[in-house]
Design a protein with these regions (language model features):
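Radical SAM enzyme [4Fe-4S]-AdoMet core and its adjacent flexible, acidic
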Residues: 142-153, 160, 164-266, 271, ...
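Accessory C-terminal segments flanking Radical SAM cores
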Residues: 245-358, 362
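Short Fe-S-cluster ligation motifs
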Residues: 51-73, 352-384
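Canonical Radical SAM [4Fe-4S] cluster-binding loop centered on the CxxxCxxC motif
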Residues: 6-47
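Charged, amphipathic alpha-helical linkers/stalks
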Residues: 371-421
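Cysteine-centered iron-sulfur cluster-binding motifs in ferredoxin-type domains/subunits
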Residues: 15-23, 76, 326-328, 332-333
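Radical SAM/AdoMet-radical enzyme domain recognition
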Residues: 49, 53-71, 80-204
Length: 488
């Protein structure tokens, strides 16, 4: 150890199959510098699954974790079959029962997804995310079968299956890899048409040695592509959560990012391959052959040992491990230097800004300009009242500053409650599609009111029954019910 406090892992990417049934030409696993997949077992052996589950349980117990997330990944995880995935889920539940909450997700290309898989995932409460790059034209630029056939119809069928009332609660979202040759607004529209609970828009993995495709003379076309979607998303009243934009907004307000591609939060994720070896993030496969390797495995090493690896330690030190250029940047708290893999350059390794530096700067500044009430609102991550103001108010001697702090805190809370109901309701399985559509329409009214007459909106949100209604709705949603049907 280097004297730092070890930050435990709470997310584990468990590779259950190392091969794939598609041949996507932008895949970082098969088309990148690291080719370690060639020497690994296709399906995870039972001994590896059992030992991985035990190691995760040991780590949870040692660090008294209240929750761990396991993502079943590949390759294509559904190639492991229903029986193979069930065996892995049994091992995970057995090892973690009584220790902490276990959240399991699976990320799939969707082409094999059917009712039998969904019934298994329903039985074990497994969330399902699917990769789709847009409409048929956009998706089929890269996501094809080996013989060149389109994968779109099979993936669309899988998404419709997940969107049905029976399995809607399993649907965790869609993941889209950006290609600037595709029309951004059309991509956004085609994804939103599936009514996913959330979207993720990913920059294609690239490095300074292997930069992303760009039109000659354009330094920020990825930012421009994302900005077109952000502006449409905002104009639509934020009908779906988009992780990239949510993370920028949250980090601008002083919070944490929901993605390793942004922000300064320490990495808390470990990959476990089908042969039981521990690896760092899969994205590092684009840097050089062996880049994600740790030299450690589940049979010999604890997860604490993995977290002591220099590559992981570097991503737990925040701003201290960024390049000098990044440390001087005004948006470093939000950008965080970009994804670690995207900083790689031969000779200087990862001590560089992201190969998407100009794009990230432009995108973050655009979001900040469109949401001025968010920018610099660091109070979201701290107490609404300073200690001095709290003491003054408690003693009955609070002055204008203390009262102002209290007023701002109450205003923030009033505004946050409807947003919390909206976000929870969109993803709740008990909320039928017509009700979600009404929620979107109501949210659009709030967004327009906030833009046109924020004072009037504050008056509405200050109604004495708003808090009671919102708390009641959140309680119903957390118990698996619909939002309050009696609310007008």
């Amino acid at each position: 150890m280097d004297g730092r406090v070890l930050i435990p892992a709470d997310q584990f990417v468990l590779k259950v199959h190392s091969r794939c049934d598609l041949a996507c030409d932008h895949c970082y696993v098969y088309e990148s510098a690291d080719q370690s997949w060639r020497g690994r077992p296709m399906a995870i052996p039972s001994a590896v699954a059992a030992r991985a589950a035990t190691r995760i349980a040991e780590h949870a117990k040692t660090h008294e974790l209240s929750r761990v997330e396991v993502v079943l990944h590949g390759g294509e995880p559904l190639l492991a079959g229903v029986a193979g995935l069930r065996a892995v889920l049994v091992e995970l539940e057995r090892a973690l029962e009584g220790l902490c909450r276990l959240d399991v997700k699976v990320h799939t290309n969707g082409v094999l997804l059917n009712e039998k898989f969904c019934e298994l995932f329903d039985e074990y409460g497994v969330g399902v995310g699917i990769s789709l790059d847009g409409d048929r034209v956009a998706n089929d630029r890269h996501r094809k079968y080996r013989d060149g056939r389109s994968s779109y119809d099979a993936v669309a069928r899988a998404i419709r299956l997940l969107s049905a009332d029976r399995f809607r609660h399993l649907f965790s979202g869609l993941l889209c890899t950006i290609d600037t040759a595709n029309d951004p607004v059309r991509v956004y529209e085609s994804l939103v048409e599936f009514d996913p609970p959330r979207l993720d828009l990913l920059l294609p993995h690239a490095t300074w040695d292997e930069p992303p495709p760009r039109t000659a003379g354009s330094a920020t076309e990825y930012a421009d592509w994302l900005i077109a979607i952000f502006d449409r998303w905002q104009a639509d009243g934020y009908p779906v959560r988009i992780r990239t934009f949510d993370s920028i907004i949250d980090t601008l307000a002083g919070g944490d990012s929901a993605t390793e591609a942004l922000g300064l939060a320490p990495v808390r994720m470990v990959v476990i391959e089908t042969d039981g070896t521990y690896e760092q993030a899969d994205s590092l496969k684009v840097a050089f052959d062996g880049a994600p390797a740790t030299g450690l495995d589940v049979f010999t090493h604890s997860l604490d040992s993995v977290l002591e690896h220099p590559g992981i330690a570097a991503r737990q030190r925040g701003i201290a491990d960024l390049s000098a250029t990044c440390r001087r940047c005004p948006v470093v708290d939000s950008c965080g230097g970009g994804m670690y893999a995207h900083r790689y350059k031969s000779g200087s390794d990862f001590e560089n800004p992201s190969v998407y530096c100009d794009d990230l700067l432009k995108l973050i500044n655009h979001v900040a300009a469109r949401l001025p009430h968010v920018t610099g609102n660091k109070a979201r991550t701290g107490p609404a009242l300073s200690e001095g103001a709290f003491t003054a108010l408690a003693s009955g001697l609070g002055g204008a500053d203390a009262v102002g702090q209290l007023t701002r805190g109450q205003r923030s809370l009033r505004r946050g409650l409807p947003a919390a109901v909206y976000e929870a309701g969109l993803g709740a399985p008990a909320v039928p599609t017509p009700t979600r559509n009404l929620m979107r329409a109501a949210w659009q009214v709030l967004v327009l009111a906030d833009s046109d007459s924020p004072g009037a909106l504050d008056s509405v949100l200050g109604h004495p029954y708003l808090r009671a209604w919102a708390v009641r709705c959140l309680g119903r949603l957390s118990r698996g019910g619909a939002a309050d049907r009696d609310a007008d």
